A protein has these predicted regions:
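Structural helix-adjacent loops and short alpha-helical linkers that scaffold large soluble proteins
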Residues: 32-46, 91-104, 160-164
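Extended amphipathic alpha-helical segments enriched in small hydrophobics
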Residues: 1, 78-114
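C-terminal beta-strand-rich structural cap/linker in extracellular carbohydrate-active enzymes
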Residues: 217-219, 226-237
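Carbohydrate-binding surface patches
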Residues: 176-220
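Short glycine/serine- and small hydrophobic-enriched flexible loop segments
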Residues: 30, 85-93, 147-157
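Catalytic cores of secreted or luminal carbohydrate-active enzymes
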Residues: 137-185
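Extended glycan-interaction surfaces of carbohydrate-active proteins
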Residues: 1-79, 112-132, 151, 157, ...
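Aromatic- and histidine-enriched alpha-helix N-cap/loop-to-helix transition segments
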Residues: 19-23, 78-86, 140-147
């Protein structure tokens, strides 16, 4: 891999570099190969309206590439739920929570609009229209189910768990009330979470949690956080 500015490109057998910007480069988000300075510049490309910040984020091919298609045409710009999940997970791992939420919300909203229009979930989606991708397969709840299930719970509701360390995070971005019931936590645990409505995104959230197992709860909002040790039963953090 090499760089043009801060992007990562495929290297051919002869040592030369491709000039194609594709979503596959963002697997690097799940590694520690880049310095913080380079990572910041690399991630910033996801907000570039000339390349990856399109109507439906994130296209698999940069929009300024000559082979980019507005209907996706599979990997010529198509928005793939699995690839998006990789990008969003990587952004969260690297600490870019705000951008991760923006992309997750954009993807979820577009998938929901297509679902309302067609009655189903699709293999992949068009980057420039609220439509399935060109020749995408319908009723595709393999990776097509990532946005309405994992995307909603982990990225929009912000409920993420580390069962091995007995830790649960609620990353609150919404201002309206929301919650989840019977959230599985490990082999035996069940958790219910209710986040109360807020008047603004900067207001400290109040989270009611009911758990039948002990765990450590961290609540995030903006650049702030609070942590509590939760015992079996119900309490508000």
């Amino acid at each position: 891999m090499g760089r043009e500015g801060a992007f990562l490109f495929d290297q051919y057998a002869d040592g030369s570099l491709s000039s194609t910007k594709g979503i596959y480069a963002y697997w690097a988000l799940l590694t520690d190969v880049l310095s913080k300075e380079r990572m910041d510049a690399f991630v910033a490309e996801l907000d570039n309206k000339e390349t990856f910040n399109r109507l439906h984020r994130v296209p698999s091919l940069a929009a300024n590439h000559p082979k980019y298609k507005d209907n996706g045409r599979y990997w010529q710009g198509g928005v793939w739920p699995g690839a998006n999940y990789m990008v969003i997970t990587g952004l969260l791992q690297q600490g870019y929570r705000k951008l991760a939420y923006e992309i997750a919300r954009n993807h979820y909203d577009n998938v929901l609009k297509v679902y309302k229009n067609t009655g189903t979930f699709w293999e992949y989606y068009a980057p420039e229209h609220e439509e399935p991708g060109f020749m995408a397969r319908p009723n595709f709840v393999g990776w097509g189910g990532l946005a309405p299930i994992s995307g909603l719970i982990e990225q929009i509701f912000g409920i993420r768990s580390n069962v091995y360390e007995k830790k649960l995070t609620v990353d609150v971005n919404l201002t309206e009330a929301y919650g989840i019931d019977r959230y599985p936590f490990g082999l035996d645990g069940l958790v219910a979470i209710k986040v109360k409505s807020r008047s603004s995104a900067t207001q400290e959230p109040q989270v009611e949690i009911t758990s039948d197992v002990p765990l450590e709860l961290t609540v995030l909002w903006g650049d702030k956080q609070k942590t509590a040790n939760v015992k079996p039963g119900t309490q508000t953090v």
